[in-house]
């Protein structure tokens, strides 16, 4: 009997670990959209925790840029082409993708989702909570990399998350909304389920 019990407990730990490793995420449904609980990190992986910045990406490019350190080398300051983020350039892990603006809009639907600037485990960001299910999603204010030279800016006070359609969800303590940014900027990516 003990052997069966320990085998069952071991299996639970293994399945739990697999559900939240670098390439797997259980996700959370907010206003009908299944969001990853962590930012995209290196191509095809998730950051370690919901508060981790992950990596920054330029719009419709698959090169990952560090979210730490003042400057980076070999920053690509050319303007990306296209009007939609292509699947070939999507840095998300398998089963996930860069969200559309319409999917990002579900987070800002005040009738169905509350948004609150907060600090979670010492990290500033926005917490979006589904009013029906009480599920919540934390987006860290990871800052961004400047379009002209890749200099890190506003970490801890500003967050920007690319959509697949040439704009981004940007926020600071007083507001969260869309803007049409320079596509050469390096922003976070929070994936949605395919």
Roles of regions detected by a PLM:
Residues 1-21:
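Bacterial Sec-dependent N-terminal signal peptides
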